[in-house]
Design a protein with these regions (language model features):
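Short, motif-level signal for alpha-helix interfacial/capping segments enriched in acidic residues
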Residues: 23-32, 54-57, 138-139, 183-193
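Catalytic core of the metallo-beta-lactamase
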Residues: 26-32, 52, 151, 157-163
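Beta-strand-turn-beta hairpins that frame and shape the catalytic cleft
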Residues: 34-43, 146-157, 215-219
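Short, basic, glycine/proline-bearing loop/turn elements
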Residues: 41-48, 81-84, 172-180
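Active-site neighborhood of phospho(di)ester-bond hydrolases with catalytic His/Asp-centered motifs
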Residues: 44-46, 72-77, 107-116, 141, ...
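Conserved beta-sheet core of the metallophosphoesterase superfamily
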Residues: 128-137, 151-155, 161, 167, ...
Length: 252
């Protein structure tokens, strides 16, 4: 194979790869929008990557019991190895097993990853209730965008694979943008523009495993709870109270 053909084939592969990664942006598809209304206290976290139960993250459980949020939003990758088609009963079973140690939380919003790790849903929204210390209401969204208001401030939550499918590639893009151009949270910034969100609203994402907060541009990445070759676990979550977001870190 000549050098010219090799270069052309390489360029073709790279082009196809990037079209696939950014397919939703290229076709200008919008995610399903789910409104929660007004909330005083909410916790947002992502990329927990649980194998069996949230008991694998004891420091997270202790932190949640201390904060006592009205609602917890899981912004994707709750699980590590559950990326398979799942009916309502199967989904209910694994969520009950996984979340029973925090059954005192009244409401959980779970945004699934579309491309890996999380269950593949047959519909955009599944609602269910779980028995526990209180009746826990769980709403599972198929790769949706969550919106809520806190103290007259708008917040949007997205996993991130809707923008760029592969998490490692998304993390690499953010790393290169930070290293070469000093542009932190690049994919989050791109997402805010693509989704046409208000400039004074906040966008909170996961997916890249690169934690960060930018108060000026109102961008946050939740970080992750499992170490991979590309990033160490950050042990971070976002607590929004009366319109003010705080990035909280615990040792894991």
């Amino acid at each position: 194979m000549s050098l010219e053909i090799l270069v052309l084939v390489t360029l073709l592969i790279v082009t196809i790869w990037n079209i696939w990664q950014f397919f939703n942006i290229l076709r200008r598809k919008a995610p399903h929008l789910f409104h929660l209304g007004d909330i005083e206290s909410v916790v947002v976290l992502s990329d927990i990557h649980i194998l069996d139960s949230i008991d694998e993250r004891p420091n997270l459980i202790r932190l949640l019991s201390k904060i006592k949020p009205s609602i917890m939003i899981i912004a994707g990758d709750l699980f590590e190895r559950e990326h398979r088609r799942m009916d309502r009963n199967s989904l209910r079973g694994i969520l009950l097993r996984t979340l029973k140690s925090i059954s005192w939380i009244r409401e959980i919003i779970y945004i699934t990853s579309l491309t890996s790790h999380d269950p593949i849903l047959h519909t955009d929204v599944i609602c269910m209730e779980m028995p526990g210390d209180v009746t826990m209401r769980i709403t599972v969204l198929k790769g949706g965008l969550v919106h809520f208001r806190s103290n007259n401030t708008d917040f949007y939550v997205l996993h991130g694979d809707f923008l760029c499918r592969n998490g490692a590639y998304a993390g690499l893009i953010n790393l290169l943008a930070t290293t070469l151009f000093r542009r932190k949270l690049f994919l989050e910034s791109l997402g805010k523009k693509f989704l046409k969100l208000e400039e004074n609203s906040w966008l909170i994402m996961g997916h890249t495993h690169m934690v960060g907060i930018d108060a000026k541009r109102r961008l946050i990445n939740c970080g992750c709870w499992k170490s991979y070759w590309r990033a160490k676990a950050t042990g971070t979550l976002v607590h929004i109270y009366k319109g003010t977001p705080n990035l909280i870190h615990v040792s894991i």
